Swiss-Prot record:
Positions that bind dCTP: 107-112, 152, 166, 176
Gene: dcd
Alphabetized UniProt keyword annotations: Hydrolase, Nucleotide metabolism, Nucleotide-binding
Source organism: Herpetosiphon aurantiacus (strain ATCC 23779 / DSM 785 / 114-95)
Protein name: dCTP deaminase
InterPro entries associated with the record: dCTP_deaminase, dUTPase-like_sf, dUTPase_trimeric
Catalytically driven reaction(s): dCTP + H2O + H(+) = dUTP + NH4(+)
């Protein structure tokens, strides 16, 4: 399994729609950077946020998720309460090839502020907008910015095709379009 370089990412995005919209190169200058990098793609977050709160004293249960656990916010910035987290989604829509696995890691700009981006791997054959969890590990409120970079996706090409890919087994998050809550 090898990591894929910018040339491969660009070709797959432009010829196969692997990333839409696709930004060819790094956008910087007053924003948290995003776009194509040497061995990855820096993704952006949309302006839709689910901020978790304890206002209603709900319990987080992945098998019986209570929508009173969060408040919905649509804005250019999101303030994450201390020691809390927010769910958001990417601007980019991904179509992962059958022989590729993607791993997503946080950007250093946010990591140095105590913010952790958590995303499960993008499995072979998966497609959709990526739901991202951003944890504020600090005792202070923290700000994140819509339409700017949040994390980097790394693309690994397998040596052979899997017997069963995500789309073959009708994965529960296939084709997700918004900030998607846990499903069983």
């Amino acid at each position: 399994m090898s990591i894929k370089a910018d040339r491969w990412i660009k070709r797959m995005a432009q010829e196969h729609g692997m990333i839409e919209p696709f930004v060819d190169g790094q956008v910087r200058g007053g924003v948290v950077s995003y776009g194509l990098s040497s061995y990855g793609y820096d993704i952006r977050i949309a302006d839709e946020f689910k901020i978790f709160t304890n206002v209603n004293s709900a319990i987080i249960d992945p098998k019986n998720f209570d929508p009173r656990s969060f408040v919905d916010v649509k804005a250019d910035v999101c303030i994450i309460p201390p020691n809390s987290f927010v769910l958001c989604r990417t601007i980019e829509y991904f179509r992962i090839p059958r022989n590729v696995l993607c791993v997503c890691v946080g950007k250093s700009t946010y990591a140095r502020c105590g913010l952790i981006a958590n995303v499960t791997p993008f499995e072979p054959g998966w497609e959709g907008y990526v739901t991202i969890e951003i944890s504020n590990t600090t005792p202070l409120p923290a700000k994140i910015y819509a339409n700017e970079g949040i994390a980097q996706v790394l693309f690994f090409e397998g040596d052979e095709l899997p017997d069963v890919a995500y789309d073959d087994r009708s994965g529960k998050y296939q084709g997700q379009t918004g900030v998607t809550l846990p499903r069983i």
